[in-house]
Amino acid sequence: MQSRLMPSGGPGRRWAFLRVPSTPQRRAFASTRFYFQDIFQSQLEDPSSAAVYSSLQASRAVPQTLTEKIVQKYSVGLAKDKFVKSGDYVTISPHRCMTHDNSWPVALKFMSIGATKLHDPKQIVMTLDHDVQNKSEKNLQKYRQIEDFAKHQGVEFYPAGRGIGHQVMVEEGYAWPGTLVVASDSHSNMYGGVGCLGTPIVRTDGASIWATGKTWWQIPPVAKVTLTGVLPPGVTGKDVIVALCGLFDKDDVLNHAIEFTGPEETMRSLSVDARLTIANMTTEWGALSGLFPIDNVLKGWLKGKATTAAMGLAEGPFKTLAPQHFTHPLLEQLFANPLTADKGAKYAKELFLDLSTLSPYVSGPNSVKVATPLKDLEAQNIKVNKAYLVSCTNSRASDIAAAARVFKEAAEKNGGKVPKIADGVEFYVAAASIPEQLAAEEAGDWQALLDAGATPLLPGCAQCIGLGTGLLEAGEVGISASNRNFKGRMGSTDAKAYLGSPEVVAASALTGKLSGPGWYQAPEGLTEVVRGEGDGIREEDRMLTAEQALEKLIGQIDNLVADGEKQFAPEESEESSGDSLTEVYPGFPERVSGEIVFCDADNINTDGIYPGKYTYQDDVSQETMAQVCMSNYDAQFSSIAKEGDILVTGFNFGCGSSREQAATAILAKKIPLVVSGSFGNIFSRNSINNALMGLEVPRLINRLRESFSGEGSDKSLTRRTGWTLTWDVRRSRIEVQEGENGPKWTHQVGELPPNVQEIIAKGGLEKWVKNEIGA
């Protein structure tokens, strides 16, 4: 079936969309739909407008998002003229790879596969930041092992107390705009604040990159988040991301890559520090990256870094490579042709938020999905026991300055007398890095906090990850400028943790209750935060250039094509999709078939799949792993499921922790394939890394639920369905037989390309690496 755009009623007036059969169909039809013009003939006759039209025609075949463009640069082994897109599995060779305190476990994996030398030492950065307050011999020994390994391999190493790894990556220039940088930590998203595509990996990926320079990645669906308006005084980047997490709280961007955009005035109002904060907490919003544009705001920040480095001011009593990474020639090269999303790039969804309608927000208690305007919490007089100005989210010099301003202004109102934090409150401060602390000291802000009674800590993750001194005790309430407030993360599970901006943390420490500094004044008539789907621009306010009008028209036509396929020929669409055959890697099965065993639940987490009490027992046998597989979800699973079954589950299967045994236990049960509505991202990575196959087929889950919802009192957690599923790998298609005498149907699934097949065929990523290095 071919889709053709035909002029109707004369050139430049209307367009008619015709579906023209290119092959015999079981039913013939044609549909015609009309759209009013968005561009006039006079514009097309103008040479500049005509040039725009020609360029759009030439480029629209492969328009890419900014995320896709960056991945394109760092993908290896692509076919000639291949343009990557969301959903593709690619082999990536990232610009940099950072590991922190987990460097030693990664090193053990690296050595266990027979590797002895890093593929590219310059690709790797090691930092110590998580447990820096722990002076036990066991921890110090681990730190020595990491440092010795780094020195032996020639890796850039930053010791405990130098700074949080993510901050080091940014301030040292490792996270460079337009590059792909990964780290074995979930807050790698932070690099997006400087236009760098940062995304997390797991430890096995780290070992693979160390040994081969490569790992695999599936490009996520990309969500465009348009920010409009300008933040009112007293509202910060932290309020933006806290509000986004709470206002869009239905997994709107779960496992998506985010691209932030907006009018020039809006983007100009967001400093790089604010962008880093927002990008950092896109992790809590559920995203795999949070990318800001490479624009003039970033250019100004980079120029400042380059000038400081050139003058020698970046140097100090600490190691820095900033003078090598931030140079004016590099900046000129970067901004000579900065990467941007193509016109007509496809986004999985679009959301918008009007910053001018925001007020200070606080997250919690104990959930980032609960976001409340500060004024509502202030009215509740919530007593605060501990306050934390820590973490890579909000402990830069600008954040420390904002907190210090609270005390400085209070001193001015008190005749110059320095105020103290409230009785019964403990206030902890740890800078994101030594350079940030030194900048705060030079400005007098660090001392202002100490004079008020704050307790200084080494630069490090500290209470953000529940390590070190000053953790929340049972019954206590804490307010933190960090990024995560899950129950028990910052101390006792019987404590309550809130998240807010640095000034809210400081004001709460000063008053002894959850409060702000009073800098925000609500605009008259403001009743709600303006947000929603789309780009937030009202149609009556939209002024279209010729280029924008054509882009819109092309988008309408593409959507029309998709709608037509869905509405008129779903069967043909399914079959035609299978005409493009996928190469099958030698040793990978062309077909996988088995009976469906159905676990009808969403959000089955990794503890439900493999109990936590076994996670750190290294001597658990395969038989035991098979026996306890899914036991926390259903104790009867082991007796119901059989070898060769295909496990089908609900949505977001494998959410939770990063334990690899969640995948290996299913393999121990000799189940070769898991099908779900959707997977948790880290589970997906661990599955492929350990040779467990997986497919996302929402249609199958919905069909099973329709078929078995009327089973009366039978509420089995695990059900043998009598249905069979066959996955045709070459045709990227499944066939489902609904019981012996039931209907049979097929459905197209995502392609599993040969590079991923190879990892699974080799027995997982570690064995693939062994093969690559000839170990």
Swiss-Prot record:
Cofactor detail note: Binds 1 [4Fe-4S] cluster per subunit.
Molecular function per GO: 4 iron, 4 sulfur cluster binding; homoaconitate hydratase activity; metal ion binding
One of the protein's GO biological processes: lysine biosynthetic process via aminoadipic acid
Keywords: Amino-acid biosynthesis, Iron, Iron-sulfur, Lyase, Lysine biosynthesis, Metal-binding, Mitochondrion, Transit peptide
Cellular localisation: Mitochondrion
Family under the similarity heading: Belongs to the aconitase/IPM isomerase family.
Protein name stated in the entry: Homoaconitase, mitochondrial
